[in-house]
Curated annotation (Swiss-Prot):
Protein name stated in the entry: UPF0587 protein GA18326
Organism of derivation: Drosophila pseudoobscura pseudoobscura
Origin organism lineage: Eukaryota, Metazoa, Ecdysozoa, Arthropoda, Hexapoda
Keyword flag Metal-binding: yes
Pfam families noted in UniProt: CXXC_Zn-b_euk (PF05907)
Domain of life of the source: Eukaryota
InterPro entries, alphabetized: CXXC_Zn-binding_euk
Amino acid sequence: MVRVGLQISATLENIDKLETSHPDYPFFVKLTCSNCGEQSDKWHDITESERVQQDTRNTAGFNFFMKCKMCSRENSIDIVEKSNVPYTADDSGKLKTIVIFDCRGLEPVDFSPRSGWKVFSSENGQSFEDVDLSEDDWVEYDQKNNNSVGVYEFVSKFIKLKK
């Protein structure tokens, strides 16, 4: 079992908080089999609120289950409960772990942010739902505070964590 953290960094303009629509946010990732090294070509979604039952060893199921096409090993990933945290104005421009994955036989290697993010403007301004970060930048106008808000230079990476 390996714990892998998803870290993000972005420049926030007039934004207090950026977060996923947890627990229903689908994390789109590309994966590598830890056993044989086979890397998936397609994006897989992992959602904390969804459980799949594929294994008799774990009656609670998993957030994601996949059998490797190359070595046939059965692998799973769970999102660690209460690990999903917001990215705040204080974090702007710095890498921060926003969610932790409990990986068994698989490791995420690439992340696609897509839509489903929530943005909260500074000074009790407007909040925006279902924000799409697939272009790594997002800009909108906060009518409550009469200023522009934006997420710029969005980047992500995965890091292995100690237990």
